[in-house]
Structure formats: structure tokens, C-alpha cells
Amino acid sequence: MRSLRIRLRVPDDFRPGILGLWHKDLLASTAAFKDKNVHILVSESNDGEFFAQAAKQLHYEVTRGSDTHGATNVRHLLKSLKNDRFVGMALDGPHGPALQVKPGSLWLSKASGRPLWLFCIKYGKHFRLNGWDNFIIPLPLTAIDIEIKYLLPENNSK
């Protein structure tokens, strides 16, 4: 991940909120925000364990998530948002369907009054895995352009 050339464009009013990404873009998104004190939600699956350990090495705070422990996870994430931190999560969840927003990120944005940001990523050289999300693995030394846009604005409780 060190060899990736990431160009990040953010709005002028970019501030703490929920960093929403598609599951296929986990690697690029993680590389872009390493060492930035971001709190992320990671699946309790075996794949999630691998990703959680890697994210901790990149100085992310990790909360493991599942349908059965939802209230505990939400409390941790809400606390981070209240403390002016970013929270990251895959909008389409750990199992898809791909590119369809699950309700958790929308609810968290409304409950916290924080904006929900969307990662829009363009890759240089990469390959895709054959899975539900077509997971993208950028090749070493490739350029990645990430633009962050509003999905839901701040104070969207209406």
C-alpha cells in the first residue's frame, strides 16, 4: 500500500462524519486514510478478521460488527462521531448486494447529525476478484484518484 500514489480531493467544508465506501474499494480507501485517527466498522467474519488486523497496523480503531451486536457497535461509533472523529464503513455491507446502500450508515448519519461522505474512486492499473463485490486490488505504483462527495449533508434528521 505504500507504493500507491493516492490523490485525494475533498470539499472545502470536509469535516468529521461517516466515510462511506463500497466494499470493492476497501484497499484504496484504507490506504487513503491510514494514520488519520479513523474508527472503522469491520465484519465479524473470517475475512473481516484479516482486514481488522491489517487496519490496526495502519492505526485505525476497529469495532467488529454483526447483526446480533448492533447496539454495542453503534454506541462505539456514535461516541467517536461525538468526539469529532471520522467513522468508516462499507455502505453495501460485508455481503452485498454490491453498490446498494444498507440502512445502517444512513441511520448513523441521521442519529449523529454528521454528514455521510461518499468515496468516488478511479483506479490506474488494477485487477478485480470474481466475487459478489468485484473487489479491486490496485497494482503497485499505480495512481488512484479519490474524490469525496456528500451522500447526506450534516444535520439531516428531517
Regions flagged by a language model, labelled:
Residues 16-69, 112, 124-129:
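Catalytic core of membrane glycerolipid acyltransferases/transacylases, capturing the structured
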Residues 77-108, 112:
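Catalytic-site beta-strand/loop segments enriched in glycine and acidic/polar residues
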Residues 56-70, 74-81, 150-153:
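Extended, non-globular alpha-helical segments
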Residues 100-157:
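A cross-family acyltransferase "interaction/gating" segment
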Residues 1-34, 60, 135, 139-146:
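Membrane-anchoring hydrophobic helices of lipid-metabolizing enzymes
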Residues 47, 51, 70-73, 77, ...:
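Amphipathic alpha-helical interface surfaces
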